[in-house]
Amino acid sequence: MNLILFGPPAAGKGTQAKRLVEQRRMVQLSTGDMLRAAIASGSELGQRVSGIMERGELVSDAIVIELIEQRLPEAEAAGGAIFDGFPRTLAQAEALDAMLAGRGRRIDLVVRLKVDDAALMQRIAGRFAESGRADDNPESFKVRLDAYNRQTAPLLPYYEGQGKLVEVDGMGSIDQVAAAIDAALTGAAA
């Protein structure tokens, strides 16, 4: 099964993806984690994307598509992938569909975590205080949320038109959200 966790920054995508990795033995393909690892390694790629991410801007389609393509064989071996933070643009969604189709696979389900902006701001403040992640400062977060609303949220009709979109209330506890995602996955597998 290939699943996209969709939602604004701080909606809980990473939290839910980690739980699914443990319970369903899927591979989490988080472009944010991959990009942060590149920055931490000091690689040429990391140096190129560091400033972009600190400003809260989106990294180019070409870079994130390349990162995902490198990790797809690992996901296939595990029996499925959880795409977290990808795709973020229509070009990325179309590239992902083409990559998977070339391997005889497809996106099975897109779960949109719905969380209101006030709760997102509260979550990001807590996460920034805990992690100190450069892209979690309030200014960068506002840029990221705006980028999500302008560039990523418009993907919803793309997946809705394919009959793959399920909306989950992301305002509940971690366990409540997990139960709703599990119900959606069970329905998609039936």
Swiss-Prot record:
Keyword Membrane: no
UniProt-listed Pfam families: ADK
Gene3D superfamilies referenced in this protein's UniProt entry, alphabetically: P-loop containing nucleotide triphosphate hydrolases
Residue numbers spanned by region NMP: 30-59
Annotated signal sequence range: none
EC number(s) recorded for this UniProt protein: 2.7.4.3
Residue segments, region LID: 126-136
Any GO CC annotation of this UniProt entry: cytoplasm
Metabolic or biological pathway: Purine metabolism; AMP biosynthesis via salvage pathway; AMP from ADP: step 1/1
Annotated AMP binding sites: T31, R36, E57, L58, V59, G85, F86, P87, R88, Q92, R133, R144
Compartments, as annotated in UniProt: Cytoplasm
InterPro entries: Adenylat/UMP-CMP_kin, Adenylat_kinase_CS, P-loop_NTPase
GO MF assignments: adenylate kinase activity; ATP binding
Chain positions recorded as ATP binding sites: A10, A11, G12, K13, G14, T15, R127, G172
Top-rank lineage group of the source organism: Bacteria
GO BP: AMP salvage
Catalytic activity entry: AMP + ATP = 2 ADP
Keywords, sorted A to Z: ATP-binding, Cytoplasm, Kinase, Nucleotide biosynthesis, Nucleotide-binding, Transferase
Described function: Catalyzes the reversible transfer of the terminal phosphate group between ATP and AMP. Plays an important role in cellular energy homeostasis and in adenine nucleotide metabolism.
PANTHER family (alphabetical): NUCLEOTIDE KINASE
HAMAP family referenced in this protein's UniProt entry, alphabetically: Adenylate_kinase_Adk
Domain comment in the entry: Consists of three domains, a large central CORE domain and two small peripheral domains, NMPbind and LID, which undergo movements during catalysis. The LID domain closes over the site of phosphoryl transfer upon ATP binding. Assembling and dissambling the active center during each catalytic cycle provides an effective means to prevent ATP hydrolysis.
Subunit record text: Monomer.
Name of the protein: Adenylate kinase
Native source organism of the sequence: Phenylobacterium zucineum (strain HLK1)
Gene: adk
